[in-house]
């Protein structure tokens, strides 16, 4: 076992921006290196080096693949599109990157960039992540669809974009092809879990009272491994639905005879990022697309493998809005439209343009799946996809079998059962039949008629498991390091707090306020300041967009002959200065509130003017917070 690092002997590790992100410049194609950025699941193994990939490697993982052959450069990405591929074009020139901020920093030296105010408005108003599909905060840069593949002809300096047909939602439930694809998914992941367990016990799987984590967990039951040798994660506190989640998970654990939350199974020591590394990882992956920061200072020296139910909303009944419903949903988070009518207009523009983009990029587009497609192209890749990469840089491989492209070929319902929970009902009643007997949290359930029809289809197309799977057990000589880890926790918590405190100090600087209020106004900035003082969960989630908007607005205003090479952390240092007076802001707005005249700005939850509306807002906010309440270990 590796030595656990003591408080007084912390080992630092550096994040190298230039090796983790790239720019392919049309004028320097010969300098492009072949590389796999991120990780790929190939032939039931995790691959990090492009040399280890098979010719027809899989779509699963979180990666951008760059291959420089004799005359062709190929760029493609995973099924979810976790990084995003960002493209700038001007006449015959093009530049491509796997990081939006990295590309902007590269281009601003030589090209005039313009600010997309519609995007900035809509992102400020959004609940958690952008609901744009291809647009970005820079008008000249777009993010490619996740099924896009780039072919660059080096001799001609030309670029072709090809769209791969993933055949999403194409297979009818009442068909052999449907069940062949579903069983392929099941065998693939149970094999992967068994192979992984033979190598390591550094495995964590979530188990809650929800649909999505249970779909992933049943694969662990089907894999026939020793569950008491891994960490089965079920949070037991009073937040959100955690109490009920833990109660349900405990019943499942008792039924299948395993224990929850045995965190002392892990064998790994830690290295530590400095403050600037954490800030740069977050910024180059997620700004300006997402409002929460999950990366922290701890990096595992030995890899960890965390399984979850990310992306489950795409395989069940969840999103049922339509275009007008989406506009209404996002507008409901921005109540002060009399004061900010331009924000409402921007929301409408972004959603309508995104919906057109989705319809044009899908093969055989089906209106019945519009919401699912919108989720895949926006929230799924931005929220879950980018979180997967944040944790990857902590040496934590975040794995969701629900991301598998084979699963997304399947239709969610059919003419005999229009309930879009049919697919998950088939999964729950096909492989581990007892698993559906346990209740779900938060009032969730699957219609008994849907379950009955799922059982009918499973009988019509029976599951045949001819694999003789002996129990996989790997007993490590594991010491209980919990006391040592407790010694570390105080120092690590302090270091993580230093990162957030620094972000907060820059957000509260007079310079930040002056730049932001030149675009908006004092009321909006002050509302975000107040929200950051009252929000318990991710208190800076509305402050991060302010810092991102300011950065990219300044990038657009720069003279190209006066640009220094700076990282995002370097940029933040230029924004430091005197702080705004929070107490003065509080007094001003508390006084207005007593007169019941406080405007509700961006739906900040500390405002109580309209109780009914506030309750609706908090419910939406808390549901999304539950989705992202996973901590890398």
Where are these regions (language model features)?
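Catalytic cores of PAPS-dependent sulfotransferases
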Residues: 154-157, 399, 433-434, 473, ...
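PAPS-dependent sulfotransferase catalytic core
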Residues: 320, 434-535, 577
